């Protein structure tokens, strides 16, 4: 593709109208940042924040023994260097991990028996080994046991308080019942809910429910305090025979007056039985009325807020929370009570729920309430006040048992309007009281319920946090063991390492990385699938949802997903909606909420200030679309602007807009943003398109798309597939397997060497058996910029993602071969290897130490001819480059046989003639069926201390040679650059003393002027001995430079010596294994019938026929098309994007053809510049091309002759006008259709056909991997039926429906064969075999084994069933 030497990248013609305001953040930062925060590896212990690993240690330590006489305190932790680097871990099957050392302090105390005062007796500090912790590679993955794994981030419900209702489903009446739930990060859940009688209940950890007031009383509140907390109190004054109450203006709204209410001037403000209106309340306030009259009927039935007591006798007339009846009211009168307090409950704005719940609960004291809670949580345990108090305190108020986390506290404060500090991560009494108050408010019609699918209520747990939780689990297990050891042993004689056994911690970490649901085998099919896997968000996993329980709401797209989670990319099938992908610009904040960037808008003017907003922060803002038309000053052109507000689309005044999207592709994920014309595709097909791009196999020759979206470069750069330059510099040397770059002077780090060596990955195997191969795209002498791409990886071309090939397609039916989405292709594609891919299989052979003796890897295998062993070397391992077919031996191995009892004669013969060859059997590694290819590598792993065979020595020698070459190059480049520096210092100076060589010959005379020629005579190693006449500081510089050179050389040598030592050392093999050999085979897969192919728009199909080139339909100029697709696949699927892509691709190819014509006619470089400028219609490109030297312009033209690459970004793609314009410029009809001719007859087809360039991918569902046939093979032990599946070399299952079909045809004999001899009739099988051998063709079917199994099953149920033979 078109590229420039200056920056090694494709020149894409961009059609986007919206300037990029902000760079897309690094695509795998979600992984890297999370783990960096967790480890804090680069920071000194004093500078570490209380997060991640540090927080875990601080939360579990100090550990005290049961008698509080000694404690184990945490000081700090440090990480060592990993034993193997990433490459070695891949090869040896090791885990890439660093050792963790923790510095702990053991303090023992003397306790004074009388006063209880503690005095320190002894302090011991020690560093303890704490197992290993896996490290993350540069690309955001982990290497566990030699395979790359990804930890998927989990989307779970945020801790905090959630209010909800049951939508009327719980009770038969359909009444809406509200509930509240306090969810901590860890600890007991607390639920409050109403029942259909409006009583309030509480559940702790989903146990049986209690009246909520029991919990409130257990907090230490009395009934009276609770009533006064939740209800407002009115004071009633007894005035002779009548009553009046104090005016409380807040409570009057909506109430009725029981009698006329008069102002101070006697004017009637509210008539009897009329409501207090706002105007009336205002009048009351103005006339300063203190009391209003109340009728007796109004007071009867009200509730006393405190005990009403007769002061003279001390007798309680009306108890707190008791209704005042007529008789009680009379008694109050007669006893001369002057005033009393009642609760304000109007059954309109304030309901009697809590008061009625109090009537239900009989607890008198907090102790009773706590004992009741203890009974519910620990049924069967006899409760004591002490144990009940301890349990209650530990439920919600003990930081070790209960943790809301900072997020939970923030959410709680936000919802309930509290002011608690963020580090208060346990519940407080106020929290519980306020939750109840908010819930009662909901029942009374105030407040709103929460939407649990809102992204403000769901947060992301990334790697760091998931591992932090696991580490805490391991530490807590260890804590118990430490406490027991402290109390069992005498502490004075112990050191910290005697107490600590880090096994539980290592085991938990190992288990998490090895077998957690969120630790997944990385999808490494191509660079896009890697990136997508790392950006995935899963609602499944421990502490998350399960597929079965997840309803429709959780899976659905939510308005808050906009710009945070992609609405398109999710798997089809049972996981739909539960697994999502992060949007392109989204990031995760420190609290785990997903944020998206917006531009700030001030008074209708869009600024370039960018702020990230979480879903909660964005609430209420009116947010304009990224494509809203603006003038040059950044103001909205239209009076009314399309915007989003609170999850709705609205038309709104431009002055009210507060934020604006940064880019149209902010909405979608990386995979979806790679689909051009996504806006013209149906969502279901876009979903398939984004999922299928992840299954595209890397092809032999990558071909970047002619019609792209501009995201291709970013994906290739961030995925780690391509090699990215670490510093600015100049390319020193390049070959296929490495690039050496000399770093610019100013860029060298303190401890750096000044040289970057990039060893490229050559034909390595990925997790999915695809081929990983990197090839350089720079030349010697090229300048490289930091962050620039210097080598292409799998599926990348010129630093851009290239998953498929640009092919010429026609939409037309062709003799039925594209029926039902089949695809017809030209043989040309197969001939040119356009869709050929390389797959690498790894096969392993292990020699073990068995009971009968050692297995041996050798080429001396009994009973095999020369032909079978022709490709094995003397060590018994296949040579590299051998072409192998199924059944060929890759590694020769013999295993000792079990000794049989020998007869005396045999023993005698043995004694005379020695051992015979018959006591070993051939257990060689052979190539499995269906695999055919070339051996490209073999690795031998042998135990430490065992003799190395010739193959191992050869492999070691080549690896060491490679390392020594790297070492030599690094030292050479450093010496050259130092040489230059020193020469510039010395030339022009005068020498102070003469310098002689070993033979006494003068190299430099005293007082001689130093020149380059003179220096050339002096050996470089002796330059430091040159003394100068008048330059003391130059001498210092000279000495410093030489010393620095020596140090850097030493450093390089030490690093390489260490690497060489590792190669020579033996390998750590599993117990019982003597030697292990891995053989790698490269398989070339050409495109063949049955392979699955797809475009980027969800247009998938299976290859139905490969047609000779001359039979394909051809264009007027004789060009045959390469692929024929069915036009009926478009209308019903509604993915019109593929047609638009085809049109634009045609225009791109047409412009390329025009450039080729210029080349063919030998136009001058100047004319070439003009032509390229015309094609791009972009001033910046024109400037760039004008600045290029002539030869590079011609090189660029040759690149562009294949087609001018274009970018049509998502949601801001090419308009219809632009499309027609491009087609016409390229010399085609604006309809994009043309007459095609039948390749077989040469006649024109009747209708015009849409023809153009489409980007097609070959997917990882290859027919060679799936096709399978069984002759005889393994049988299941129990049923004696053949196994199923290709891996087991199984048969094809014949189910009920197939039997019905055979019955329908009346094919009785065939059916009997299917069900007996071909399946599980054991005796019949052997009889059949014998009959075939003898040449008799008769079927004698016996009894199927599965029938015997059925009889045995019945007999196990005590039903005696037996078969009786029919009597003749």
Curated annotation (Swiss-Prot):
Q: Name one GO biological process term.
A: DNA-templated transcription
Q: Which EC numbers characterise this protein's activity in its record?
A: 2.7.7.6
As recorded in Swiss-Prot or TrEMBL, the protein's gene is named rpoB
Source organism per entry reads: Syntrophotalea carbinolica (strain DSM 2380 / NBRC 103641 / GraBd1)
A Gene Ontology CC term for this entry?
DNA-directed RNA polymerase complex
Quote the InterPro entries the UniProt record gives.
DNA-dir_RNA_pol_bsu_ext_1_sf, DNA-dir_RNA_pol_bsu_external_1, DNA-dir_RNA_pol_su2, DNA-dir_RNAP_su2_dom, DNA-dir_RNAP_su2_hyb_sf, RNA_pol_bsu_bac, RNA_pol_bsu_CS, RNA_pol_bsu_protrusion
This chain's protein is named DNA-directed RNA polymerase subunit beta
Its function?
DNA-dependent RNA polymerase catalyzes the transcription of DNA into RNA using the four ribonucleoside triphosphates as substrates.
The record's top EC class is transferase
Catalytic reactions of this protein = RNA(n) + a ribonucleoside 5'-triphosphate = RNA(n+1) + diphosphate
The family annotation for this protein states: Belongs to the RNA polymerase beta chain family.
- Which superkingdom is the protein from? Bacteria
The entry's keywords: DNA-directed RNA polymerase, Nucleotidyltransferase, Transcription, Transferase
């Amino acid at each position: 593709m078109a590229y420039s030497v200056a920056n090694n990248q494709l020149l894409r013609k961009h059609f986007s109208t919206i300037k990029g305001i902000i760079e897309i953040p690094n695509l795998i930062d979600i992984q890297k940042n999370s783990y960096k925060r967790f480890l804090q590896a680069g920071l000194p212990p004093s500078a570490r924040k209380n997060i991640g690993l540090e927080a875990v240690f601080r939360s579990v330590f100090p550990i005290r023994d049961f008698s509080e006489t000694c404690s184990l305190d945490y000081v700090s932790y440090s990480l060592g260097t990993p034993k193997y680097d990433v490459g070695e871990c891949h090869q040896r099957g090791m885990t890439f991990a660093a050792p963790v050392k923790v510095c702990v302090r053991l303090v023992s105390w003397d306790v004074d028996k009388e006063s209880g005062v503690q005095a320190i007796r002894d302090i011991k500090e020690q560093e303890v080994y704490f197992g290993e912790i896996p490290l993350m590679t540069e690309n955001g993955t982990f290497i566990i046991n030699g395979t790359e794994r990804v930890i998927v981030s989990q989307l779970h419900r945020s801790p905090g308080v959630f209010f909800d209702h049951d939508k009327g489903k719980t009770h038969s009446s359909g009444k809406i019942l509200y509930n509240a739930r306090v969810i901590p990060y860890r600890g007991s859940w607390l639920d409050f809910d109403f029942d259909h009688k409006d009583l309030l209940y509480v559940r702790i950890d989903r146990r049986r429910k209690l009246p909520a007031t029991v919990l409130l009383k257990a907090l230490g509140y009395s009934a009276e305090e609770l009533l006064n907390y939740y209800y407002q109190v009115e004071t009633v004054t007894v005035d002779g025979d009548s009553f009046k109450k104090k005016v409380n203006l807040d409570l009057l709204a909506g109430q009725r007056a029981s009698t006329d209410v008069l102002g101070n001037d006697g004017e009637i403000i509210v008539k009897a039985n009329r409501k207090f209106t706002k105007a009336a309340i205002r009048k009351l306030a103005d006339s300063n009325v203190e009391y209003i009259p109340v009728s007796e009927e109004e007071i009867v039935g009200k509730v006393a807020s405190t005990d009403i007591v007769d002061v003279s006798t001390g007798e309680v007339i009306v108890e707190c929370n008791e209704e005042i009846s007529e008789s009680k009211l009379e008694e109050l009168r007669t006893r001369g009570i002057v005033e009393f307090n009642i609760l304000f409950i109007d059954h309109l704005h304030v309901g009697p729920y809590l008061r009625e719940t109090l009537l239900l609960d009989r607890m008198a004291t907090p102790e009773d309430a706590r004992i009741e809670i203890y009974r519910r949580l620990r049924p069967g345990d006899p409760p004591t006040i002490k144990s009940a108090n301890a349990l209650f305190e530990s439920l919600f108020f003990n930081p070790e048992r209960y943790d809301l986390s900072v997020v939970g506290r923030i959410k709680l404060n936000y919802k309930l309007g509290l002011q608690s500090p963020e580090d208060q991560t346990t519940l407080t009494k106020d929290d519980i009281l306020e939750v109840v108050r908010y819930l009662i408010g909901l029942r009374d019609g105030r407040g709103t319920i929460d939407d649990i699918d809102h992204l403000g209520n769901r947060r992301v747990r990334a790697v760091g946090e998931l591992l932090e939780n696991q580490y805490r689990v391991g530490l807590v297990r260890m804590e118990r063991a430490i406490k027991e050891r402290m109390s069992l042993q005498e502490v004075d004689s112990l050191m910290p390492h005697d107490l600590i056994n880090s096994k539980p911690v290592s085991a938990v970490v190992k288990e998490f990385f090895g077998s957690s649901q969120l630790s997944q085998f990385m999808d490494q099919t191509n660079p896009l699938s890697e990136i997508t896997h790392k950006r995935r968000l899963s609602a499944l996993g421990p502490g998350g949802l399960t597929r079965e329980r997840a309803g429709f709401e959780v899976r659905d797209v939510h308005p808050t997903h906009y710009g945070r989670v992609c609405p398109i990319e999710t798997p089809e099938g049972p996981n739909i909606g539960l697994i999502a992908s992060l949007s392109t610009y989204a990031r995760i904040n420190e609290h785990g909420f997903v944020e998206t960037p917006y531009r700030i808008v001030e008074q209708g003017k869009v600024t370039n200030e960018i702020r990230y907003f979480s879903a909660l922060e964005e609430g209420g803002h009116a947010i304009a679309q990224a494509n809203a038309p603006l003038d040059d000053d950044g103001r909205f052109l239209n009076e009314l602007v399309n915007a989003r507000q609170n999850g709705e689309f609205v038309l709104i005044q431009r002055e009210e807009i507060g934020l604006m999207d940064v880019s149209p592709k902010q909405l979608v994920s990386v995979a979806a943003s790679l689909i051009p014309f996504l806006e013209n595709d149906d969502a279901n097909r876009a979903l398939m398109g984004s999922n299928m791009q992840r299954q595209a196999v890397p092809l032999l020759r990558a071909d970047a798309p002619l019609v792209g979206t501009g995201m291709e470069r970013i994906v290739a750069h961030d995925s780690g597939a391509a090699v990215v330059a670490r510093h600015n510099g100049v390319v020193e040397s390049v070959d296929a397997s490495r690039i050496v770059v000399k770093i610019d002077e100013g860029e060298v780090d303190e401890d750096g060497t000044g040289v970057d060596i990039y060893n490229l990955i050559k034909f390595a195997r990925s997790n999915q058996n695809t081929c990983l191969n990197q090839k350089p795209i720079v030349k010697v002498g090229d300048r490289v910029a930091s962050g620039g791409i210097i080598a292409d990886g799998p599926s990348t071309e010129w630093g851009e993602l290239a998953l498929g090939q640009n092919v010429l397609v026609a939409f037309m039916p062709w003799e039925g071969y594209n029926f039902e989405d089949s695809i017809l292709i030209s043989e040309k594609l197969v001939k040119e290897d356009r869709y050929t891919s390389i797959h690498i299989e790894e096969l392993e052979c292990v020699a073990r130490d068995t009971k009968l003796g050692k297995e041996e890897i050798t080429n001396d295998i009994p009973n095999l001819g020369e032909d079978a062993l022709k490709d094995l070397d003397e060590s018994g391992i296949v040579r590299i480059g051998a072409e192998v077919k199924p059944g060929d031996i890759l590694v020769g191995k013999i295993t000792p046989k079990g000794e049989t009892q020998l007869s005396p004669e045999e023993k005698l013969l043995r004694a005379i003639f020695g051992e015979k060859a018959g006591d070993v059997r051939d257990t060689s590694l052979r190539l499995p069926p269906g695999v055919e290819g070339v051996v490209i590598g073999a690795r031998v792993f042998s135990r430490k201390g065992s003799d190395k065979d010739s193959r191992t020595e050869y492999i070691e020698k080549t690896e060491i040679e490679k390392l020594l070459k790297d070492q030599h190059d690094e030292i050479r480049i450093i010496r050259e650059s130092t040489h230059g520096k020193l020469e510039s210092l010395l030339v022009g100076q005068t020498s102070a003393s003469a310098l002689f060589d070993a033979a006494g010959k003068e190299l430099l005379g005293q007082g001689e002027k130093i020149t380059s020629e003179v220096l050339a005579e002096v050996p470089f190693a002796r330059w430091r001995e040159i003394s100068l006449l008048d330059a003391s500081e130059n001498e210092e510089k000279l000495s410093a430079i030489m010393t620095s050179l020596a140090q850097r050389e030493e450093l390089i040598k030490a690093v390489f010596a260490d690497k060489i030592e590792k190669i020579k050392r033996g390998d750590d093999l599993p117990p019982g294994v003597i030697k292990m050999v891995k053989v790698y085979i490269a398989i070339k897969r050409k495109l063949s019938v049955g392979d699955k192919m797809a475009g980027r728009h969800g247009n998938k199909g299976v290859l139905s026929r490969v047609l000779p080139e001359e039979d394909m339909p051809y264009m007027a100029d004789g060009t045959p098309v390469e692929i024929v697709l069915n036009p009926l696949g478009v209308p019903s699927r509604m993915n019109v994007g593929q047609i638009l892509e085809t049109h634009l691709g045609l225009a791109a190819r047409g412009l390329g053809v025009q450039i080729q014509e210029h080349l063919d006619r030998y136009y001058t470089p100047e004319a070439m510049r003009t032509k390229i400028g015309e094609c791009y219609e972009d001033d910046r490109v024109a400037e760039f091309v004008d600045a290029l030297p002539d030869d590079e312009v011609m090189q660029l033209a040759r690149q562009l002759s294949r087609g001018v690459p274009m970018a049509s970004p998502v949601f801001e793609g090419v308009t219809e006008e632009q499309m027609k314009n491009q087609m016409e410029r390229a010399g085609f009809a604006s309809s994009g259709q043309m007459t095609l001719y039948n390749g077989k007859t040469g006649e024109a087809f009747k209708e015009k056909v849409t023809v153009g360039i489409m980007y097609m991918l070959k997917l990882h569902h290859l027919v060679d991997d799936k096709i399978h046939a069984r002759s005889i093979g393994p049988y299941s032990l129990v049923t004696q039926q053949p196994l199923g599946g290709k891996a087991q070399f199984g048969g094809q299952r014949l189910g009920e429906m197939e039997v019905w079909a055979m019955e329908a045809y009346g094919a009785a004999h065939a059916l009997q064969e299917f069900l007996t001899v071909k399946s599980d009739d054991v005796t019949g099988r052997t009889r059949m075999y014998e009959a075939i051998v003898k040449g008799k063709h008769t079927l004698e079917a016996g009894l199927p084994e599965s029938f015997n199994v059925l009889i045995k099953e019945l007999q196990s149920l005590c039903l005696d069933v037996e078969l009786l033979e029919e009597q003749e």
